[in-house]
Structures are given as structure tokens and as C-alpha cells.
Amino acid sequence: MEADKIEVGQTYTCESPLLKKSFKGTVEKIYDLSVLVDVHEFEDTDAKKVDDLNGRLVVPFYSVNPS
């Protein structure tokens, strides 16, 4: 997704190599090439990893999709 279309406080579907499945999260902060996402909807198989990461991930713009 293009950076100018991503908004803080909005929920998006994202992907990360750290998790096995895609997840939904709310953008907390926008960086130069990525965003900080608060993860709130994820698969049970990723629950431990999300907990280890304190429910937050930095993902690149190209891994963010509209929900």
C-alpha cells in the first residue's frame, strides 16, 4: 500500500515473516518505509509469537492492505 494512503488509528490487514498467517492491526506510528502496528486479530497459531512481541510489529508499507 502507498504511504500516503495509510493513516494512524486505522485498522489494516498486514503480513509479516515473523507470523505464519496474516493479521489485523491498528497503525500507531508511520516511519519512512514502514509502520508500527498494534496487533489485535491473529490466528491461534501465532498467539505465542504475538505475545513475545508485546502485540506490536513494524511492517513495511508493501505488507499493509486495506481491511
Model regions and ranges:
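Intrinsically disordered, low-complexity, charged/polar segments
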Residues: E43-S67
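Short beta-strand-centered aromatic/proline hotspots
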Residues: K21-K29
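Short, acidic/hydrophobic/Gly-rich beta-strand patch recurrent on exposed beta strands
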Residues: L36-H40
